[in-house]
């Protein structure tokens, strides 16, 4: 044993940890004994000899390479990979290889100050005995984020930004002349002008926009958007272009289209919706047992020329973003809320899929057509559910005419029956049933949440969902299946025409096994192998068995993680979750750019056009998939913000809850009354030292053997509500 300069005795483990940290901090460098002893302050002969012995063992393990009798360097494996860096708030950063392999741990000291989403090149360290696999970032290839959002702190000689979220791990220094008028307490957007290096560890930036005072609702929502690089302002030149659009529907244009203005037509949307991009028409065909159901979609691309300034902006945004209290539209307001919105009693241009269906919702014939419609009525989902669940006489006056609103309730009931038939067949074919409840808020005029609740799937939402699914599937089959033979080629030997598909791969087998391990201790079963149909039916049975239990949310969450993410691609592999061989997004061009691409391709091919450039469309698909994920992350952050804001005035109050998650650092608890979730940290679990039993998802007291397990009922007290960090902290109520 040696002695440290402070008199503390050094043991082998301590010296090994010191050496490991030193060599990892200098990857690729040769360090001499003299440098090592000086850096680690190993001044005594016993301490130096202990360090030499440990380095010899590390070399024997291939973790170090011996350069000479008095020098070593870190042994980096020759394997070099590129991929994405993922930063975590708990310090457990990782590297995700491009080849789809498992994430690899990256210690903070080996991260080269990489941020989440950065493209990096790494080298792998030789793996020490009983240690996890680690990677070292050797080069940052591309920065994902060059802007940060946070709170300004202005001092006498300098200023800095305390960044929101987990993208940045350090404050950003700002020269006072680069503040753009920002003051202490302001939320601001800062552009990074200098990244950390070996010479300077500081992040330096300049203010590009002052959002306003911290805590203001609009400021905070804009801050969330800015944090993800999403636009919170609409460019004036794009708005001007939208204002100049000619919206006249001429007689010549109507003559080129199928006319549905006298056919019973209506929209069903959320009660607060403004952009109505889909409508349904319904009529019984004369001298036939069939019904005609039209799925009418706003003809957005009729108004937006490909390559125009409006089109380029929509392409860049790729999707509308739905925060808790606002929508950030993909298109200018004049287009999405007025010109293209299928508002009642207004003539509108549509692109439509018209089905002839029998009583059992079997498609006997269909056609794709550009149309003109005039909606008779605008329904909210709640109104439709009331009609469908009511046996009372029709609440609307009837004039007896085909297009009158008096015909609507009977039409709704027939369409509801058909939708349920379509839904049943879909699940029998192997579709996975994820009816997840979504957390929603009632918001007052100041943007403050007054109530939080779960929205559930209803017959009204399912009615719209099933007919939209039918339209999306049908047009995808029209292109993808019609021209293909068994070899994936068209009859003349050429490849099928380029198209945009919505694809969803089969579940990851390892993640299915993880799901099985999670649910097994609670008596649930799930298949991890077999046919696609067998696995999906097993998943559906699991969801059904967990329905209404305290474990429902957890099981749904873990099951969703086992599923691959759906995305856009020109390379079709089908949609596993829906059990469709061909699927696309056709029905929401107001809010999704892929739907605009689909409309353009269908129009081109209907007119006899040649196949579009696949590489170009694949690039657009990749961008759209990426932007969809970014938008979802921003939406989740807005929910977290409102959840913490809702609980901010309830600190000190007690609630019944249940354990919704177990981690090595504490337990997550969901309040039964309002579904808000917070953390009880390990340090707040008094009376024992608790160890994490990862296999059984529980914490176990070392002395008392008391367990905190998933699903357990628990009484909590709200301890802290940190709105800036979007974190809720609970403690046990009996403390």
Regions found by a protein language model. Give the residues of each.
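Electropositive polyanion-binding surfaces
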Residues: 38, 189, 194-196, 213, ...
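A short macromolecule-binding patch
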Residues: 102-107, 168-174, 675-692
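Charge-lined substrate channels and their catalytic hotspots, especially those that engage the 3′ end
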Residues: 2-294, 301-346, 378, 385-386, ...
């Amino acid at each position: 044993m040696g002695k440290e300069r402070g008199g503390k005795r050094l043991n082998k483990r301590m010296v090994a940890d010191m050496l490991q940290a030193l060599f990892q901090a200098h990857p690729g460098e040769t360090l001499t004994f003299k440098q090592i002893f000086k850096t680690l302050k190993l001044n005594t002969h016993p301490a130096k000899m202990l360090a030499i012995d440990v380095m010899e063992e590390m070399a024997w393990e291939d973790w170090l390479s011996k350069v000479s009798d008095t020098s070593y360097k870190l042994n980096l494996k020759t394997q070099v990979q590129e991929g994405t860096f993922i930063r975590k708030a708990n310090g457990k950063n990782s590297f995700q290889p491009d080849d789809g392999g498992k994430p690899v741990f990256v210690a903070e000291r080996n991260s080269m100050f990489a941020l989440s989403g950065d493209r990096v090149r790494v080298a792998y360290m030789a793996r020490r005995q009983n240690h996890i696999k680690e990677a070292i970032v050797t080069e940052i290839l591309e920065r994902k984020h060059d802007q940060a959002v946070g709170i300004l702190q202005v001092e006498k000689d300098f200023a800095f930004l305390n960044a929101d979220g987990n993208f940045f791990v350090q404050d950003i220094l700002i020269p006072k002349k680069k503040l753009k008028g920002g003051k202490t307490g302001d939320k601001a957007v800062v552009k990074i002008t200098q990244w950390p290096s070996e010479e300077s560890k500081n992040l330096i930036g300049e203010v590009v926009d002052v959002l306003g005072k911290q805590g203001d609702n609009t400021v905070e929502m804009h801050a969330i958007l800015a944090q993800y690089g999403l636009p919170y302002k609409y460019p004036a030149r794009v708005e001007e272009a939208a204002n100049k659009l000619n919206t006249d529907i001429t007689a010549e244009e109507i003559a080129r289209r199928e006319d549905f203005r006298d056919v019973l037509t209506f929209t069903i949307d959320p009660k607060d919706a403004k952009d109505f991009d889909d409508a349904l028409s319904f009529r019984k065909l004369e001298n036939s047992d069939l019904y005609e159901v039209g799925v009418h979609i706003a003809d957005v691309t009729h108004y937006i020329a490909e390559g125009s300034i409006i089109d380029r902006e929509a392409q860049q945004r790729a999707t509308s973003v739905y925060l808790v209290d606002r929508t950030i539209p993909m298109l200018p307001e004049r287009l999405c809320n007025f010109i293209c919105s299928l508002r009642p009693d207004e003539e509108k241009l549509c692109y439509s899929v018209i089905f002839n269906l029998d009583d059992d919702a079997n498609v006997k014939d269909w056609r794709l057509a550009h149309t003109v419609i005039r909606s008779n009525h605008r329904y909210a989902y709640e109104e439709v559910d009331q009609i469908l669940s009511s046996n009372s006489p029709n609440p609307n006056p009837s004039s007896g005419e085909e297009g009158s609103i008096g015909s609507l309730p009977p039409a709704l009931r027939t369409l509801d029956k058909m939708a349920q038939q379509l839904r049943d067949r879909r699940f029998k074919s192997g579709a996975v049933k994820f009816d997840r409840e979504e957390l929603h808020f009632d918001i007052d005029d100041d943007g403050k949440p007054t109530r939080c609740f779960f929205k559930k799937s209803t017959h009204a939402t399912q009615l719209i969902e099933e007919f939209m699914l039918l339209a999306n599937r049908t047009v995808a089959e029209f292109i993808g299946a019609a021209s293909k033979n068994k070899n994936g080629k068209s009859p003349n030997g050429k490849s099928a025409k380029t198209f945009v598909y919505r694809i969803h791969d089969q579940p990851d087998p390892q993640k299915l096994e993880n799901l099985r391990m999670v649910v097994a201790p609670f008596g649930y079963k799930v298949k991890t192998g077999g046919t696609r149909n067998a696995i999906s039916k097993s998943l559906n049975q699991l969801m059904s068995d967990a329905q209404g239990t305290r474990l429902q949310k957890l099981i749904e969450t873990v099951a969703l993680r086992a599923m691959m993410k759906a995305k856009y691609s020109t390379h079709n592999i089908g949609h596993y979750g829906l059990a469709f061989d061909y699927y696309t997004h056709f029905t929401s061009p107001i809010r999704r750019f892929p739907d605009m691409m689909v409309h353009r391709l269908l129009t081109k091919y209907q007119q006899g056009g040649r196949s579009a450039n696949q590489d170009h469309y694949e690039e657009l698909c990749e961008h759209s998939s990426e932007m969809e994920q970014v938008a979802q992350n921003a939406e989740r952050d807005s929910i977290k913000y409102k959840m913490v804001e809702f609980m901010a005035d309830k600190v000190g109050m007690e609630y019944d809850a249940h354990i919704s998650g177990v981690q090595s650092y504490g337990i997550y608890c969901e309040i039964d009354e309002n579904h808000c979730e917070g953390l009880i940290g390990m340090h707040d679990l008094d009376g024992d030292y608790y160890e994490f039993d990862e296999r059984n998802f529980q914490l176990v007291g070392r002395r008392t053997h008391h367990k905190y397990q998933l699903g357990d009922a628990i009484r909590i007290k709200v301890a802290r509500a940190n709105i800036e960090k979007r974190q809720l902290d609970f403690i046990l109520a009996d403390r």
